[in-house]
Amino acid sequence: MSNIPTELKYASSHEWIRKEEDGSYTVGITEHAQELLGDMVFVELPEVGDTVTAGDDCAVAESVKAASDIYAPISGEVIAVNEALEDSPELVNSDAYGEGWFFRVMPSDETEVDALLDAEGYQAVIDEE
């Protein structure tokens, strides 16, 4: 069974977000998603300054098995990207909720966070797959 930290919020498309002290949100993919994808070989990230819209694809994770679109869980401006993934995409596999984060977003509508799933709700999504 995948690790699903209770302090994070989740999208049914297998992304997680964590609120940071500056009001931004860090975005990554869940441990469950990286297990399904397998060993990461390349991650394409949005650019700092890009505007992302909740539910729209904004990044790509390529593994030995497949390429998968990554969707923005919330709308806002990308304020940082995890440049370490350029040389070490395997960080997504080894530390999905830590060093394997994808990008940070300053939200344009923080109420979108309320529409995301808690850990229990995300577990229910996995159970239905």
Curated annotation (Swiss-Prot):
Q: Name one GO biological process term.
A: glycine decarboxylation via glycine cleavage system
- Pfam families recorded: GCV_H
List required co-factors.
(R)-lipoate
The record ties this protein, via InterPro entries, to: 2-oxoA_DH_lipoyl-BS, Biotin_lipoyl, GCV_H, GCV_H/Fam206, GCV_H_sub, Single_hybrid_motif
Family matches, as PROSITE patterns = BIOTINYL_LIPOYL, LIPOYL
Protein's UniProt keywords contain Transmembrane: no
**What keywords would UniProt list here?**
Lipoyl
Q: Domain Lipoyl-binding spans what residues? A: 24-106
| Gene Ontology cellular-component annotations | cytosol; glycine cleavage complex
On subunit structure and binding partners, the annotation says: The glycine cleavage system is composed of four proteins: P, T, L and H.
- What is the role of this chain? The glycine cleavage system catalyzes the degradation of glycine. The H protein shuttles the methylamine group of glycine from the P protein to the T protein.
Q: Which family does it belong to?
A: Belongs to the GcvH family.
Q: What is this protein called?
A: Glycine cleavage system H protein
Q: Gene behind this chain?
A: gcvH
